[in-house]
Amino acid sequence: CDFSFIETQRLYQKIKNYHFTPAAVISTIFMKTLAQYSETPGLSINVTLFNRQLLHEDVNGILGEFTNNAVISYQEKTDSLLDAIRATQEQMWRLVQYRKFEGSNILKMLSSGRAGKAIMPVVFTCMLEGNVSKVTKKRYSFKEEYAISQTPQVVLDHHVRDDLGYLKISWDY
Protein backbone atom coordinates (compact mmCIF):
# COMPACT_ATOMS: atom_id res chain seq x y z
CA CYS A 1 0.00 0.00 0.00
CA ASP A 2 1.51 3.31 -1.06
CA PHE A 3 0.23 6.66 0.15
CA SER A 4 0.55 9.74 -2.03
CA PHE A 5 2.95 12.49 -1.01
CA ILE A 6 0.01 14.74 0.00
CA GLU A 7 -1.71 11.96 1.99
CA THR A 8 1.55 11.18 3.77
CA GLN A 9 2.24 14.80 4.69
CA ARG A 10 -1.34 15.30 5.94
CA LEU A 11 -1.09 12.17 8.06
CA TYR A 12 2.27 13.22 9.52
CA GLN A 13 0.89 16.69 10.36
CA LYS A 14 -2.15 15.25 12.15
CA ILE A 15 0.07 12.87 14.10
CA LYS A 16 2.41 15.73 15.00
CA ASN A 17 -0.55 17.78 16.27
CA TYR A 18 -1.17 15.05 18.86
CA HIS A 19 2.54 14.87 19.77
CA PHE A 20 2.85 11.25 18.65
CA THR A 21 5.28 9.58 16.30
CA PRO A 22 4.03 7.88 13.12
CA ALA A 23 5.55 4.60 14.40
CA ALA A 24 3.41 4.71 17.56
CA VAL A 25 0.22 5.44 15.63
CA ILE A 26 0.72 2.83 12.92
CA SER A 27 1.90 0.10 15.31
CA THR A 28 -1.06 0.72 17.64
CA ILE A 29 -3.55 0.43 14.78
CA PHE A 30 -1.74 -2.72 13.62
CA MET A 31 -1.89 -4.30 17.10
CA LYS A 32 -5.52 -3.25 17.57
CA THR A 33 -6.40 -4.91 14.26
CA LEU A 34 -4.50 -8.09 15.22
CA ALA A 35 -6.27 -8.18 18.59
CA GLN A 36 -9.69 -7.82 16.99
CA TYR A 37 -9.15 -10.42 14.26
CA SER A 38 -7.49 -12.93 16.59
CA GLU A 39 -10.11 -12.28 19.27
CA THR A 40 -7.27 -11.80 21.74
CA PRO A 41 -7.60 -8.81 24.08
CA GLY A 42 -3.87 -8.58 24.75
CA LEU A 43 -0.85 -9.34 22.63
CA SER A 44 2.79 -8.50 22.15
CA ILE A 45 4.79 -8.04 18.97
CA ASN A 46 8.45 -7.98 18.10
CA VAL A 47 9.64 -4.51 17.07
CA THR A 48 12.73 -3.89 14.98
CA LEU A 49 14.87 -1.07 16.36
CA PHE A 50 17.42 0.63 14.16
CA ASN A 51 20.48 1.01 16.30
CA ARG A 52 23.16 2.67 14.17
CA GLN A 53 25.32 4.34 16.80
CA LEU A 54 27.76 7.09 15.91
CA LEU A 55 30.90 5.15 16.73
CA HIS A 56 32.72 6.65 13.74
CA GLU A 57 32.17 9.79 11.64
CA ASP A 58 31.51 7.71 8.50
CA VAL A 59 29.10 5.22 10.11
CA ASN A 60 26.19 6.50 7.99
CA GLY A 61 28.11 5.52 4.87
CA ILE A 62 28.37 1.89 5.95
CA LEU A 63 25.92 -0.58 4.45
CA GLY A 64 25.17 -3.21 7.05
CA GLU A 65 22.93 -4.62 9.74
CA PHE A 66 22.37 -2.12 12.54
CA THR A 67 19.24 -3.52 14.14
CA ASN A 68 18.10 -4.78 17.47
CA ASN A 69 14.70 -6.06 18.51
CA ALA A 70 12.35 -5.43 21.38
CA VAL A 71 8.82 -6.28 22.45
CA ILE A 72 5.83 -3.96 22.75
CA SER A 73 2.42 -4.92 24.09
CA TYR A 74 -1.15 -3.99 23.38
CA GLN A 75 -4.11 -4.47 25.69
CA GLU A 76 -7.61 -3.95 24.29
CA LYS A 77 -9.47 -1.69 26.68
CA THR A 78 -12.50 0.53 26.48
CA ASP A 79 -10.17 3.54 26.41
CA SER A 80 -10.03 5.70 23.33
CA LEU A 81 -7.69 5.05 20.42
CA LEU A 82 -5.72 8.12 21.53
CA ASP A 83 -5.13 6.50 24.94
CA ALA A 84 -3.96 3.30 23.25
CA ILE A 85 -1.56 5.26 21.02
CA ARG A 86 -0.28 7.16 24.06
CA ALA A 87 0.45 3.85 25.85
CA THR A 88 2.34 2.55 22.80
CA GLN A 89 4.26 5.82 22.48
CA GLU A 90 5.37 5.55 26.12
CA GLN A 91 6.60 1.99 25.51
CA MET A 92 8.54 3.13 22.46
CA TRP A 93 10.26 5.94 24.39
CA ARG A 94 11.31 3.36 27.00
CA LEU A 95 12.68 1.12 24.25
CA VAL A 96 14.86 3.96 22.99
CA GLN A 97 16.29 4.39 26.49
CA TYR A 98 17.30 0.72 26.64
CA ARG A 99 18.21 0.16 22.99
CA LYS A 100 21.69 -1.09 23.88
CA PHE A 101 20.15 -4.11 25.62
CA GLU A 102 20.17 -7.01 23.17
CA GLY A 103 16.59 -7.88 22.30
CA SER A 104 17.64 -11.42 21.46
CA ASN A 105 18.25 -11.88 25.21
CA ILE A 106 14.59 -11.01 25.86
CA LEU A 107 13.49 -13.62 23.33
CA LYS A 108 15.80 -16.22 24.90
CA MET A 109 14.28 -15.55 28.33
CA LEU A 110 10.76 -15.83 26.92
CA SER A 111 11.55 -19.06 25.07
CA SER A 112 12.88 -20.90 28.10
CA GLY A 113 11.20 -24.30 28.14
CA ARG A 114 9.44 -23.77 24.80
CA ALA A 115 11.87 -25.41 22.38
CA GLY A 116 10.81 -25.34 18.75
CA LYS A 117 7.91 -22.93 19.25
CA ALA A 118 7.71 -19.45 17.77
CA ILE A 119 7.93 -16.91 20.59
CA MET A 120 7.16 -13.64 18.80
CA PRO A 121 5.86 -14.63 15.35
CA VAL A 122 4.63 -11.12 14.47
CA VAL A 123 7.13 -8.36 13.69
CA PHE A 124 6.71 -4.61 13.16
CA THR A 125 9.54 -3.13 11.09
CA CYS A 126 9.35 0.64 10.84
CA MET A 127 11.77 2.75 8.78
CA LEU A 128 10.23 6.15 8.44
CA GLU A 129 13.30 7.78 6.93
CA GLY A 130 13.53 5.33 4.04
CA ASN A 131 16.42 5.05 1.63
CA VAL A 132 17.10 8.78 1.50
CA SER A 133 20.46 10.41 1.92
CA LYS A 134 20.11 13.00 4.67
CA VAL A 135 22.75 15.11 2.97
CA THR A 136 21.29 15.27 -0.54
CA LYS A 137 17.67 14.27 0.11
CA LYS A 138 17.93 12.14 -3.03
CA ARG A 139 17.50 8.44 -3.56
CA TYR A 140 20.59 6.34 -3.37
CA SER A 141 21.84 4.89 -6.63
CA PHE A 142 19.53 1.89 -6.44
CA LYS A 143 15.80 1.46 -6.95
CA GLU A 144 13.82 -1.23 -5.18
CA GLU A 145 11.98 -3.40 -7.67
CA TYR A 146 10.96 -6.23 -5.37
CA ALA A 147 11.60 -7.07 -1.75
CA ILE A 148 10.71 -9.82 0.66
CA SER A 149 12.01 -10.73 4.05
CA GLN A 150 11.97 -14.29 5.27
CA THR A 151 12.84 -14.97 8.87
CA PRO A 152 12.50 -18.32 10.66
CA GLN A 153 9.57 -18.45 13.07
CA VAL A 154 8.07 -15.17 11.78
CA VAL A 155 4.51 -15.53 10.55
CA LEU A 156 3.91 -11.87 9.67
CA ASP A 157 6.35 -8.97 9.24
CA HIS A 158 4.61 -5.61 8.87
CA HIS A 159 6.90 -3.12 7.09
CA VAL A 160 6.36 0.64 7.27
CA ARG A 161 8.72 3.01 5.51
CA ASP A 162 8.95 6.51 4.12
CA ASP A 163 10.46 6.82 0.66
CA LEU A 164 11.09 10.51 -0.14
CA GLY A 165 7.88 11.55 1.60
CA TYR A 166 5.68 8.69 0.40
CA LEU A 167 4.46 6.35 3.15
CA LYS A 168 4.71 2.71 2.07
CA ILE A 169 3.21 -0.21 3.96
CA SER A 170 3.68 -3.88 3.15
CA TRP A 171 3.44 -7.29 4.79
CA ASP A 172 5.66 -10.33 4.41
CA TYR A 173 3.95 -13.57 5.43
Question: Where are the predicted features?
Answer:
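Generic structural detector for well-ordered beta-strands
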Residues: 2, 73-75, 159, 172
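Regulatory/sensor and coupling segments of signal-transduction and defense proteins
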Residues: 11, 128, 172
